[in-house]
């Protein structure tokens, strides 16, 4: 997407960037003086969705690919396409690494890299063993997932399903007791 702005607007945005850079330099100097437990500013600078996602959950170097896919797709489709790609690319690092990274990155795309849902709302993404000894995907949620909203929560399950298929994991098989409980509820 090409943005057109007047020279005055370009100058204004350039000035904002410079002032923000100056603030980060000042904060870094203050932090290094030892008056704060953290030595660096906690919030990384990011110019767009792709940079926010990469800074929030990674993996390093994913921002250009997010931009490329997002040019021709909506946010949800972009998340699903990248989930599948990441699962395939990271498979060699281990099924659980690929599963977790793909789910977190895709959820961050859906939540625009501004909510804590991908980092704090998803406690863990791993595999678990079904009652028939096959492996399936498991997502463990915490309270901050609520901030993502119902659509993002539901899409996180869809994303995990797309990733588990890419990683050749079986689907979850509920126990008879779980089935009965759901019928009752």
Task: For the regions a language model picked out, list residue spans one by one.
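Extended, Lys/Arg-rich, non-catalytic nucleic-acid recognition/anchoring regions
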Residues: 1-185
């Amino acid at each position: 997407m090409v943005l057109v702005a007047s020279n005055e607007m370009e100058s204004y945005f350039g000035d904002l960037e410079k002032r923000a850079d100056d603030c980060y330099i000042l904060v870094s100097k203050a932090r290094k003086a030892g008056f704060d437990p953290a030595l660096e500013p906690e919030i990384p600078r990011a110019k767009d969705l792709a940079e926010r996602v990469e800074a929030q959950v990674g993996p390093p170097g994913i921002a250009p690919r997010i931009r490329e896919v997002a040019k021709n797709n909506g946010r949800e489709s972009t998340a699903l396409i990248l989930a599948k790609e990441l699962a395939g690319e990271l498979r060699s690092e281990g099924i659980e690494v690929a599963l977790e990274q793909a789910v977190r990155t895709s959820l961050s795309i859906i939540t625009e890299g501004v909510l804590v849902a991908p980092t704090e709302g998803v406690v863990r993404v791993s595999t678990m063993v079904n009652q028939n000894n096959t492996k399936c995907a498991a997502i463990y949620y915490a309270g901050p997932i609520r901030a993502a909203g119902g659509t993002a929560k539901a899409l996180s399950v869809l994303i995990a399903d797309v990733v588990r298929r890419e990683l050749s994991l079986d689907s979850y098989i509920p126990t008879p007791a779980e089935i009965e409980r759901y019928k009752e509820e």
